[in-house]
């Protein structure tokens, strides 16, 4: 299969599944299971629930896809990815 036959969609990671797979809600409303592309594994790009991603799929199987890109957040660099700030966890007396 040539790469020209693959189609791309954007979506939102809703759940992290075992074996490096993700449940992704596409912008079109469909829900699929996707795995991480080799280049993302090689460069150690972590994907968490709630991340916007680009999925590459074969037109022959629209239930599975390959996660090829994680979109950057609108948060400023250095800001925590999730949860409340933990600044006061260890205080001096």
From Swiss-Prot:
Classify the main location.
cytoplasm
Q: Which GO terms describe its molecular function?
A: ribosome binding; rRNA binding; translation initiation factor activity
Q: Where in the cell is it found?
A: Cytoplasm
S1-like domain location, by residue?
A: 1-72
Region (Disordered) residue ranges read 69-93
Q: Name one GO cellular component term.
A: cytosol
Keywords attached to this entry: Cytoplasm, Initiation factor, Protein biosynthesis, RNA-binding, rRNA-binding
Q: From the record, what ranges are coiled-coil? A: none
Entry-linked PROSITE patterns? S1_IF1_TYPE (PS50832)
Keyword Secreted: yes or no? no
Known HAMAP family for this protein?
A: IF_1
* Family as reported in the entry's similarity comment: Belongs to the IF-1 family.
Oligomer status and interactors: Component of the 30S ribosomal translation pre-initiation complex which assembles on the 30S ribosome in the order IF-2 and IF-3, IF-1 and N-formylmethionyl-tRNA(fMet); mRNA recruitment can occur at any time during PIC assembly.
**What does the protein in this record do?**
One of the essential components for the initiation of protein synthesis. Stabilizes the binding of IF-2 and IF-3 on the 30S subunit to which N-formylmethionyl-tRNA(fMet) subsequently binds. Helps modulate mRNA selection, yielding the 30S pre-initiation complex (PIC). Upon addition of the 50S ribosomal subunit IF-1, IF-2 and IF-3 are released leaving the mature 70S translation initiation complex.
Question: Could you tell me what this protein is called?
Answer: Translation initiation factor IF-1
Species name = Nitrobacter hamburgensis (strain DSM 10229 / NCIMB 13809 / X14)
Gene name of this polypeptide: infA
């Amino acid at each position: 299969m040539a790469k020209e036959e693959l189609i791309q969609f954007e979506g939102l990671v809703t759940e992290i599944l075992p074996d490096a797979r993700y449940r992704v809600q596409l912008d079109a409303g469909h829900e699929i299971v996707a795995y991480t592309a080799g280049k993302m594994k090689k460069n150690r790009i972590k994907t968490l629930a709630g991340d916007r991603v680009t999925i590459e799929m074969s037109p022959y199987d629209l239930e599975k896809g390959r996660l090829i890109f994680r979109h950057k957040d609108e948060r400023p660099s250095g800001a925590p990815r999730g949860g409340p700030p933990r600044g006061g966890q260890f205080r001096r007396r």
